[in-house]
């Protein structure tokens, strides 16, 4: 697409960043001074009843700056990147038609990528094929299936851990249904996003600062009742650790503690470590991201001014 046709597209803003980087606070500040509406880009914030451990904006924050695509699924339900793209495009169109600018804020980089570049034409899930894979796993173990994937699609096998049955079975399922590997199919992109996107990433200047923020926030969550929140989910009886919701960072570790698998101190240690690992993955995505402007989360006022310098002109 040339620059002239790109300039005629509606505007959108991406505000990306690792967990605990201050994205939400900045987005709320920006909404006070720009004609923007916020859309959450977070695979954990979609779940109802999961507020503390996901650092969901509180009632006052949501009153000041409503977020779309929050609380749209029960923790028992799945939600894919394709679901997100469909929902986000609908919300963006609604915001644009009202004469405002969509501001997409979050840290689920796969969702941002799916929205920006479109999705690969992957086949839909097939319950029969999935059942066959699960039966094989029950007989041979997931390690054997991982070796099978290694022969079929070594690139995907290198990315997928043998202890990740959901992604492992999906990679095999795609091959059994289509005859093509996940790697082959994901190299074919779908439709690009029909918006002129201004992309920002916010993060502390150093990894140590981010690690401190993560640890502090995890302890704040515990003080705010995170254990009680997860116990309420556990008490439902229909949730388990194979669900994406319960595999969310912090929830998986708290679940292990509630089940008596680990001690409280071990839960805290693992929860902080898992959150740091998540932040590391998010930063790896962002460092390879094209066309992004970096903001320093330790200087929120300056970050806000930098966004306004770029976006102020398009918002007029």
Curated annotation (Swiss-Prot):
UniProt keyword annotations, A-Z: ATP-binding, Magnesium, Nucleotide-binding, Transferase, tRNA processing
Binding site for substrate: 19-24
Family: Belongs to the IPP transferase family.
InterPro entries per record: Dimethylallyltransferase, IPT, P-loop_NTPase
Reaction it catalyzes: adenosine(37) in tRNA + dimethylallyl diphosphate = N(6)-dimethylallyladenosine(37) in tRNA + diphosphate
Cofactors: Mg(2+)
Organism classification: Bacteria, Pseudomonadati, Pseudomonadota, Gammaproteobacteria, Enterobacterales
Pfam families: IPPT
Protein name, as recorded: tRNA dimethylallyltransferase
Stretches the record annotates as Interaction with substrate tRNA: 42-45, 166-170, 247-252
Enzyme class, broadest EC rank: transferase
Enzyme Commission number, as recorded: 2.5.1.75
Task of the protein: Catalyzes the transfer of a dimethylallyl group onto the adenine at position 37 in tRNAs that read codons beginning with uridine, leading to the formation of N6-(dimethylallyl)adenosine (i(6)A).
GO molecular function: ATP binding; tRNA dimethylallyltransferase activity
Sites marked Interaction with substrate tRNA: 108, 130
Gene: miaA
Binding site for ATP: 17-24
């Amino acid at each position: 697409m040339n620059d002239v046709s790109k300039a005629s597209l509606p505007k959108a803003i991406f505000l990306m960043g690792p967990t605990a980087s201050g994205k939400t606070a900045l987005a709320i500040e920006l909404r006070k001074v720009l004609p923007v509406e916020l859309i959450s880009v977070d695979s954990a914030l979609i779940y109802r009843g999961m507020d503390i451990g996901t650092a969901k904006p509180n009632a006052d924050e949501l009153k000041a700056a409503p977020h779309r695509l929050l609380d749209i699924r029960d923790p028992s339900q799945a939600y894919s990147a394709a679901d997100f793209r469909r929902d986000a495009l609908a919300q963006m169109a609604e915001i644009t038609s009202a004469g405002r600018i969509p501001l997409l804020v979050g840290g689920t980089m796969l969702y941002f990528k799916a929205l920006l570049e479109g999705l690969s034409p992957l086949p839909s899930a097939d319950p029969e094929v999935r059942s066959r894979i699960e039966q094989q796993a029950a007989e041979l173990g997931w390690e054997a299936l991982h070796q099978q994937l290694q022969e079929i699609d070594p690139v995907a096998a290198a990315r997928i851990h043998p202890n990740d049955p959901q992604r492992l079975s999906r990679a095999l399922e795609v091959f059994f249904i289509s005859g093509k590997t996940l790697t082959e199919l994901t190299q074919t992109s779908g439709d690009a996003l029909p918006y002129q996107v201004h992309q920002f990433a916010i993060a502390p200047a150093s990894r140590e600062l981010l690690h401190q923020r993560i640890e502090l926030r995890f302890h704040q969550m515990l003080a705010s009742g995170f254990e009680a929140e997860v116990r309420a989910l556990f008490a439902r009886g229909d949730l388990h650790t194979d669900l994406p919701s319960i595999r969310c960072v912090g929830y998986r570790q708290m679940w292990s503690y509630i089940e008596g698998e680990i001690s409280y101190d071990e839960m805290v240690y693992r929860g902080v470590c898992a959150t740091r690992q998540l932040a590391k993955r998010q930063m790896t995505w962002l460092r390879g991201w094209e066309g992004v402007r970096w903001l320093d989360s330790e200087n929120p006022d300056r970050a806000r001014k930098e966004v306004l310098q770029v976006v102020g002109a398009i918002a007029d």
